[in-house]
Regions:
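Short beta-strand element of the alpha/beta-hydrolase
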Residues: 324-334
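Conserved beta-strand position repeated across blades of beta-propeller domains
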Residues: 28, 94, 144, 193, ...
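Active-site-proximal cap/loop segments of hydrolase catalytic domains
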Residues: 348-358, 364-594, 601, 606
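Residue-level detector of Asp-centered blade-edge/turn motifs that repeat once per structural unit
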Residues: 31-32, 97-98, 147-148, 195-196, ...
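Non-catalytic accessory segments flanking enzyme active sites
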Residues: 37-40, 46-48, 62-70, 75, ...
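A flexible loop/linker signature enriched in serine peptidases of the S9 family
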Residues: 1-5, 13, 19-25, 39-69, ...
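Short loop/turn segments that connect beta-strands within beta-propeller blades
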Residues: 8-12, 74-78, 125-129, 172-176, ...
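Hydrophobic beta-strand positions that form the internal "hydrophobic ladder"
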Residues: 1, 36, 102, 149-152, ...
Length: 612
């Protein structure tokens, strides 16, 4: 990825237009085709590289992380990329379509905490080198220039305590003032795209539903002040959940990624911008799904004990029998600044329709702290870790029991990251409510987590709102390890060995305490090379099968002793590829082939990864 090539729209030979000494992480092409802006890390100094080649491979934690810089490349081929001197580490850049300006997102350092919490949008005048900080108020999402180059739209947080970027703001380039479009309401913006100089489309979420909307933006020609001339939009009454969007300014058509309860993400075409517009599906990535029978999926509303209205997505068991109670798998999303939509929710870490086909229900609650219900709702869990937010999960289970669907003695809980934290809490503090737990990359000790996570500022600003040393009791009481004596839930713990976000020691701590107490079965599975979530197909398949196996064993099967450690993946073993290995032949006095060995095979892709 150290070279950039272009190929004509009608095909032909590729042509190299840029190269760099480190990986090119992103680029933007000037509208007139004369220049490229590149994102790449700083090259390693020659003397440092020489020392590394000598074996000096020490890391200076956080200090020696390379900054991502912006480089400019002329398309005429004259010379290599030139460094654009800017303060900070860059992560996103967009050429202004009409002016010699560049919008760049800059963080104070290359660290992930600064990237998440403190990225600011800068408009750089390439003629003078002056960079103007727009000072967006919170977390930063997508950026997009209007086609006339006079407005810059962005998805941002309402302030530094807003847990997730989801507010739509527009900056005028004349006075660098914001037009706040979405601060008052409950909708959460997912993406944005301009179809003309003044029309901005944006899909997003309102609870479990999806919506698609556009604004017609006005701008005073003298003062540059922005306003809203017209709006159109409504929640989607169909089954599609809208995601990323892109626009063609020539005909104002849109391409948008959508998923539904019966298919994973596909590309749709939206023709025109008026009510009753054309809307049709363009791709079909998994045609075999049309032959599958799907269980009923629906939105369930319920109230928490304190009266707060909540909702979640329920997948009923396939071929459900009236009056019969079923096992339930409670899926808890991470964040908690995220949410479940009523679309495709069967993934490698979420059993969904797979569980339904095995005679189990699945419930996906949007507990307090979730996005899609307004900034105020998403902040309700702050300063109250493992408090009412996790009580909401129990209230959801109780509601399903009262509905007559769920057997309260056969409820399992699972989730990753913050959902893993909820699983650890459910398997200790609320252990009397759960017959099985599968915890993934989750927190177990808020005290030690505070010193090992790479997002300390985010944990402070949008979660706890207090530092460890300011309230030790709060952090201790909200830690699952504080409640291990209550453990009765068979717990499967899984974690990536290279997780920088929630250190694997969080799983090791909980495992060791539960193992020593020996009050219920516990197993720990570590994935080498994986971080905060599994990326490799083999790791995902292993996780998916272990999750399903654990839930079936303890919710439907005999329970008791843990299921077998080894997994049957249900895939044929490939023919072994034999390679020669070399050894010293004493008789011949030379290196020669002394044995053959079989190289392991890694599977490529699996059904459990669809839609992830």
């Amino acid at each position: 990825t150290r070279c950039l090539y272009i190929i004509g729209a009608k095909g032909g030979e590729r042509r190299k237009v840029a190269s760099h000494t480190t990986d090119i992480q992103g680029y933007s092409w000037k509208a007139d085709g004369t220049r490229l802006a590149l994102l790449a890390t700083e090259p390693v100094a020659k003397d440092k590289k020489a020392r590394q080649d000598q074996g000096f491979s020490q890391e200076i934690y956080e200090e020696d992380a390379p900054f991502v810089r912006v480089y400019l490349q002329h398309m005429d081929g004259g010379g290599g990329p030139e460094l654009l001197k800017l303060e900070g580490s860059a992560s996103e850049l967009h050429f202004n379509p009409k002016e010699n300006k560049l919008a760049v997102a800059l963080a104070p350092s290359p660290g992930i905490d600064d990237h998440i919490m403190f990225r600011k949008v800068h408009i750089v005048d390439l003629a003078t080198g002056k960079a103007t900080n727009l000072n967006n108020p919170g977390k930063l999402g997508q950026l997009a220039w209007s086609p006339d180059g006079k407005k810059l739209a962005m998805i941002t947080g309402a302030d530094k305590h807003d847990p997730k970027e989801g507010r739509l703001w527009i900056a005028g380039t004349q006075d660098q003032t914001f037009l706040k479009l979405y601060t008052p309401n409950k909708r959460h913006v997912e993406s944005l795209a301009w179809t003309s100089p003044n029309v901005l489309w944006h899909p997003g979420s309102e609870g479990t539903r999806s919506f698609l909307e556009w604004f017609q933006v006005s701008q005073d020609p003298k003062t540059g002040k922005l306003g809203i001339a017209e709006t159109w939009g409504q929640p989607n009454n169909g089954t599609e959940v809208f995601g990323h969007i892109s626009a063609a300014t020539v005909n104002e058509n849109l391409a948008i990624v959508c998923h539904t309860p019966t298919h994973a993400s596909e590309v749709y075409l939206v023709e025109g911008r008026v009510d009753g517009r054309g809307f049709r599906r363009l791709t079909n990535s998994n045609p075999w799904l049309k032959d599958m029978k799907f269980a009923k999926q629906e939105v369930v509303k319920y109230k928490a004990k304190d009266g707060l209205e909540l909702e979640g997505v329920l997948i009923r068991p396939l071929n459900e029998e009236k009056g019969k109670r079923y096992p339930l798998v409670l899926h808890v999303h991470g964040g908690p600044e995220s949410h479940y939509s009523n679309g495709w929710i069967t993934r490698y870490a979420d059993l969904g329709q797979v569980a339904a086909a095995r005679g189990m229900a699945s419930f996906y609650p949007n507990y307090r702290g979730s996005t899609g219900y307004g900034v105020e709702f998403s902040m309700k869990g702050q300063k109250d870790a493992a408090g009412k937010e996790f009580d909401d999960l129990i209230d959801g289970v109780d509601h399903l029991v009262k509905m007559g669907l769920v057997d309260e003695k056969k409820v399992g809980i699972t989730g990753g990251s913050y959902g893993g934290y909820a699983t650890a809490w459910g398997s200790t503090y609320y252990s009397h409510r759960f017959a099985a737990g599968v915890m993934f990359v989750g927190l177990s000790n808020l005290v030690s987590c505070a010193g090992t996570t790479d997002i300390a500022q985010e944990m402070f600003l949008v979660h706890h709102r207090k530092w460890l040393w300011e309230d030790w009791d709060y952090h201790i009481k909200a830690s699952p390890v504080k409640h291990v004596e209550k453990h009765k839930t068979p717990l499967l713990i899984l974690h990536g060995k290279n997780d920088p976000r929630v250190h694997p020691s969080q799983s090791l701590e909980l495992y060791r305490h539960l193992k020593v107490r020996n009050q219920a079965p516990v197993r720990l599975v570590l994935y080498p090379g994986e971080g905060h979530g599994n990326r490799r197909a083999a790791s995902r398949l292993d996780y998916n099968i272990r999750l399903l196996q654990w839930m079936e064993h303890y919710l439907k099967g005999p329970g008791g002793k843990m299921p077998a450690m080894d997994i049957d993946y249900g895939i044929p073993a490939p023919a072994a590829k034999k390679t020669a290995s070399l050894g010293w032949d004493d008789r011949r006095g030379e290196l020669s082939r002394v044995s053959d060995r079989a190289e392991p095979w890694l599977g490529r892709g699996c059904p459990c990864c669809i839609g992830w």
